[in-house]
Amino acid sequence: MKIEDNFSFQNNDVIVVGCSSGPDSMALVDMLLKIRDKYQLCLVIAHVNHNVRKESYEEAEYLKEYCDLNNLLFESMVIEEYGDDNFHNEARNIRYNFFENLVKKYNANYLMTAHHGDDLIETILMRMVRGSNLNGYSGFKEVVLMDGYKIVRPLIHYTKQELEDYVKENNVKYYVDSSNDKDKYTRNRYRKYLLPFCHFIQNKIPH
């Protein structure tokens, strides 16, 4: 599994990498580390502490130590309070505002996130149930052109299981967000109950 299979890097690219310390984003960081010297990449690891779990401070500290050990730039923020809006939407808006500020600070070419194939399926299913138009059925794009930079999701061709296998095979330490198991969040319910069924059906289709 090589990130170069899905994206063409250029020498001296500056990349802001959204990283939660979970298996998906740690896989992304590890893949980028493996090619950093080849392309002389400048990697800025961006972490947002959502401040909803007591373990989140331990995770942030681990990620800082990991970045120090690997000579990676590390930037972090803590969300001190939320409004009354949808939690996931509000957290996402805060994250991307933070990422965009870092892109400007470092004059980055790219913002990379660890969204994978399962995330894409979840998004499509949620939009279908909510009555999205045909454009919504395509989910999110692998590359999005922004003002002066691009958002890139280079892991979109892999499943979550493949990324979990990757971090275990490469001995990459990661943390698991326990809040992902809570049924009160809509996306979690899709992830726990609908996605396994989709994979089951997919495995039954002759290839």
Give short role names for the model-derived ranges.
Residues Y185-H207:
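ATP/NTP-dependent adenylation/nucleotidyl-transfer catalytic domains that generate, transfer
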